[in-house]
Curated annotation (Swiss-Prot):
Disulfide bonds: none annotated. Belongs to the UPF0262 family. This is UPF0262 protein Xaut_1232.
Length: 164
């Protein structure tokens, strides 16, 4: 876990995919949000499996399997590097709270004052930060990633729960 990106240009993700079976059918708006989150992560990230003797860049396939988050990490060539299975239990509360605040935020945009919208958005960002920190902690010793990359990855974990 680090606050600054790894200095190696190879310590990064070049592709990220979400398992279709894990996300199910969704609206065009939700599909667009997921695609944007993936693009943001690929554009700017620091990501390296701990103890990997090889070089990146890496590809990441994210799925849900038996109530576990599966991070399947490979090299661009397709060579398997590692697959991590993380329990979703530690994420349940923060993801649930995050969705509740997001729903409040989207409802507030239609009718609330700018100060109310800002207050809700601050809460949303705080929960997003909490989820990102939790993700970094759960990946400690498994994957080295900076906070901004953890934020973008947390967005995608939420996307797996956001089935439209």
């Amino acid at each position: 876990m680090s606050d600054k990106p790894d200095a190696r240009p190879s310590a990064r993700l070049s592709a990220v995919t979400l398992d279709d079976a894990s996300i199910g059918h969704s609206s065009a708006d939700i599909d667009h949000e997921r695609a944007t989150a993936i693009w943001d992560l690929i554009e700017d990230n620091s990501f390296a499996p701990c103890g990997d003797p090889g070089e990146g860049p890496y590809t990441l396939h994210i799925s849900l399997m038996e109530s576990r988050l599966v991070l399947d990490i490979k090299r661009e060539s397709g060579e398997q590097v590692v697959q991590h299975h993380l329990s979703l239990t530690p994420f349940r509360k923060v993801v649930k709270d995050y969705f509740l605040v997001c729903e409040s935020y989207y409802n507030a945009i239609r009718s609330a004052s700018p100060s109310q919208i800002e207050a809700i958005d601050m809460g949303r960002r705080g929960l997003h930060n909490e989820g990102s920190t939790l993700l970094q902690e759960r990946l400690e010793g498994k994957v080295d990633l900076d906070f901004d990359s953890a934020r973008r990855l947390f967005t995608l974990i939420c996307a797996l729960h956001w089935k439209g």
